[in-house]
């Protein structure tokens, strides 16, 4: 499981950096675990360069049994929906004209139980689109309507990946609603936007990353199954969001160093965090191509012969939609700011852009990866 966690973490960082390059000052949010699960399912049906490229981009070199690893992580995470408003939906739709081989169907059946579906894009496009939209809406408890837009698919679509993920967290320690105030959020050195700022004084795991003058904090959600880790620059020092230095230094190794529990310690913290909701529809295709998935999306070079005898088949599209909501909600309310319990306090004031991950603590896999630049 460790090898898979490291692979997923490396892929998450690679894709995050690609998305940052394409949208330097925008909010970013995606679910690396959803994408890597879907691409690993597609990989089962590929051969040759296509299979090798997926393996390289997803960093599977040292991972022994990829499908089984994902099965374990997925079932662990899905159990959490009884504690949180959390859903990760991952689907691979294959046009029935491809007549997927029985070998492919049987080898994916157990590890990717309900993630594979054969549909009819060619002759029943509108009906299929309607079915996928209503199925995703139902699976996400109504969070995502019409995940497929007009131009997401066509009657030429052969293979389609659809990811839909949302999370509405409940904290281990509730933020007192009476302490939420409107404050300026500094989107750059010179500009601000108003934001509802939540405030709490409590003990959290805190660390300093001195070489990039940042702080990192771990905020556990109820039952500690998930945590939000936030990397916050001490100030906005560059001419953009203040995150340039972190983004340059960020790689799979530095992320592991920064989030290593041994570099963090419990501290009494005066915490200020924006209340926010981010919903993103990302098109990861160009970013994945830049990372090295050269043949997967190209009909003349992709090799899906492990799935179908049909020639000229490629992955037609990747739809990836995610929603994250951060509010005061949580467990027992604890000391209200202003009470004299905490004498010496560290401040963690997220009133300027920050990078965050939502981590599954049991497997230490990254469920969501994002940056918050503007309310």
Swiss-Prot record:
CDD domains associated with the record: serpinB5_maspin
GO molecular function, one term: serine-type endopeptidase inhibitor activity
The organism's place on the tree of life at top rank: Eukaryota
Biological process (GO), any one: regulation of epithelial cell proliferation
Keywords from the named record: Glycoprotein, Secreted
Site feature: Reactive bond homolog: 340-341
GO cellular component terms listed in the entry, alphabetical order: cornified envelope; cytoplasm; extracellular space; sarcoplasm
Subcellular location per the Swiss-Prot or TrEMBL entry: Secreted, Extracellular space
Principal location: secreted
Glycan attachment positions: 133, 298, 361
Self-association state and partner proteins as the record states: Interacts with IRF6.
Similarity comment text for this entry: Belongs to the serpin family. Ov-serpin subfamily.
General function of this protein: Tumor suppressor. It blocks the growth, invasion, and metastatic properties of mammary tumors. As it does not undergo the S (stressed) to R (relaxed) conformational transition characteristic of active serpins, it exhibits no serine protease inhibitory activity.
Protein name (record): Serpin B5
Gene name per UniProt: Serpinb5
